[in-house]
Amino acid sequence: MPKRAQPFTEPPLVPVRWGILGAAHIAVSKVIPAMQRSAMTPVVAIASRDIGKARAAARELGVARAYGSYEELIDDPDVDAIYNPLPNHLHVPWSIRAAEAGKHVLCEKPLSLSAAEARQLIGARDRTGVQIGEAFMMRAHPQWAAVRELLAEGRVGELKLVAGHFSYFRRDPTDVRNVPEWGGGALMDVGCYPITIARWLFGEEPLEVTGMLEYDPVYNVDRLGSGLLRFPSGQATFSSGSQVVHYQRVQLFGTEGRIDVEIPFSPAADHACRIFIDDGLALGGALAEEVQFPAVDQYRLQGERFSEAVRGVGHVPTTLEDAMGNMAVIDALFRSAKSRRWEVPE
């Protein structure tokens, strides 16, 4: 009797071994622990210019190797991919160095100090053939997949307006976000979130933008900002701040309804998320529907999706071209705040 053929199953993907550049708070408190919870993203090394910090972080997190220089980690043959959470002005130089060593790179947002600098990183990616992406972790969260599906289904009719806000309070003079030469300021740090979300949801680039910024008189970084983006299909408004109460929200308005995203950007890994859908017909502004999403670690999901792209499955969640588009908008907003005119992203 002939043997029955066994069903074909895809072999498991080979894990991507990660090295971490720097012992930044986001790396030590969020990204490394998240990656360590996935078999796809083992963290094998961490580097700091202060070897003591690298060893302390490695010991605390159970990372096998600690290096006292970024070069040593990048040149480690057992590292497949680099996570780069260094200060903003070091994103592109060290990402290029890693790419030239044959390492894939997941670089923290904002990717660069300008769109022109982002183009340099695109050139390095194209020369080396490695995968490089920007770390907008919220794009991996299931709530945003649901929002995009609702928009595709026409649940709110035609999307016409995206309104976003992200702020926190931080006046620490030692914080890298308060150093202008290092790419500090609220627009670069948190204003980039509602901007990238609006571009992602509209699926197009803004034709022109206008913005207003208020600067801290001591640190000389923008501490409060707002802007308007005009797209071919609609508009987006945003506000951001680094010296106002912590808050985040995104609202989408269409011709037939709206969607309210309660915690759009940085929900805690143990915190469930909700979106609200209003068809505009409920009396007194009552929300017609609430959709809940179980708690997930979006940093883990981000690492897994990027690693899958490295292994040829799927694509990098936020491409360099997408990141460059976001920087072009931010560049134009800085110009607009000075010129007090509408500016065209370029």
Place the predicted regions along the sequence by residue.
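N-terminal Rossmann-like dinucleotide-binding module
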Residues: M1-L61
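C-terminal helix-rich "cap/oligomerization" subdomain common to oxidoreductases
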Residues: M1-P15, A81-Y83, R119, R305-E346
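Hydrophobic residues in well-ordered beta-strands that form the structural core
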Residues: A27, Y67, N84, L106-C107, ...
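A general structural signal for well-ordered alpha-helical segments in protein cores
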Residues: V28, I32, V44, A54, ...
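Beta-loop-alpha module in the N-terminal Rossmann-like domain of NAD(P)-dependent dehydrogenases
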Residues: L61-G123
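Rossmann-fold dehydrogenase core element
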Residues: R119-M137, G157-L161
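Predominantly a Rossmann-like dinucleotide-binding segment in NAD(P)-dependent oxidoreductases
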Residues: M138-V218, R340
